[in-house]
Design a protein with these regions (language model features):
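Extended, folded cores of ATP/NTP-driven motor/assembly subunits in large transport
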Residues: 1-290
Length: 290
């Protein structure tokens, strides 16, 4: 299997729709920060309530994930974003370049933090998927606007750039993809974003080009979580991608799941009581402790 084959999508279109499987299609929206940590408690509660309403928009037919991407940007990429000037603004351009160098010298590491929401639906074909994805996209953008969050939809080239920057961290090569190059080159979109190789021969990490990486899975089962848990992850001064996968569950399925969980807990409790009796403990005491 090639490195390209290890990237799990079928095609990405110019309009930003990605066909992940024969029947699953996605789009991605980039969004900005809300200044949550510096807000007072009343504002924090209002922000929290707003996000709850935002999440409640998604029904069980829409799968979505939040992606928080922290990547070290090369100094050259910053400088490219500041075009050279030979006019009255030349001194400003030099000053900006100097600031970049000073920040990196101070150990800022040039970490660039971006945030995305990717949503997907199941459909028989692109013709039926496209209009529904566009309706969901409009709703999400309106919901972000109500939260006071700026957001924009990524087109196909922009989605490929995000993947390129993650998968090719080991190379300073710029992202040079252009749609018009595909027909005459005989290449696919994956050829522009895939690393030189993937190597999955170790238990706790893998190799992606010349970089070593590791993936951890966190299943959230706690009834309460600190509102700082995500911030603490993203404050790590290193290349890190945090994905939060969310799947809404319809009410009937949720009730069935709760009942099944209660039944499993009751069974476990009975088994523990039986073990206690066999060990010579009083079953009533064991039940009380449970």
């Amino acid at each position: 299997m090639s490195a390209q084959d290890s990237i799990p999508y079928l095609q990405i279109r110019v309009d930003g729709i990605c066909q992940v499987t024969p029947t699953h299609y996605t789009k991605t929206i980039q969004f900005r920060d809300i200044n949550y940590q510096l807000s007072d408690n009343e504002d924090k509660q209002a922000i929290f309530d707003g996000w709850c309403d935002f999440l409640n928009y998604f029904d069980s037919s829409i799968k979505f994930q939040f992606s928080f991407v922290n990547l070290t940007a090369l100094r050259e990429s910053f400088v490219r974003a500041i075009p050279s000037r030979s006019d009255q603004f030349e001194s400003i351009q030099r000053e900006l370049s100097k600031i970049i160098e000073e920040q990196q010298a101070k150990g800022n590491n040039g970490i660039v933090k971006t945030k995305y929401l990717t949503f997907g639906i199941d459909a028989d074909n692109i013709r039926s998927a496209k209009p529904r994805l566009e309706r969901i996209e409009t709703d999400i953008l309106n919901n972000f606007k109500r939260l006071g969050v700026s957001a924009e939809v990524l087109n196909g080239q922009e989605r490929l750039r995000v993947l390129h920057d993650i998968l090719r961290m080991d190379t300073p090569e710029p992202f040079t993809f252009r749609w018009e190059d595909l027909p005459r080159s005989g290449l696919s979109t994956k050829d522009y974003i895939a690393p030189s190789s993937f190597l999955f021969n170790r238990a706790k990490d893998f190799r992606m080009g010349k970089k070593f990486a590791s993936v951890s899975f966190l299943q959230i089962l706690a009834p309460e979580l600190s509102d700082r848990i995500l911030k603490d992850f993203l404050d790590i001064e290193s290349n890190i991608v945090v994905n939060i996968h969310v799947q809404s569950v319809d009410q009937v399925s949720a009730i069935k799941t709760i009942k099944r969980t209660i039944t499993d807990l009751d069974k476990s409790k009975i088994e523990e009581q039986k073990k206690a009796v066999r060990a010579g403990y009083d079953m009533d005491i064991s039940a009380t402790r449970s």
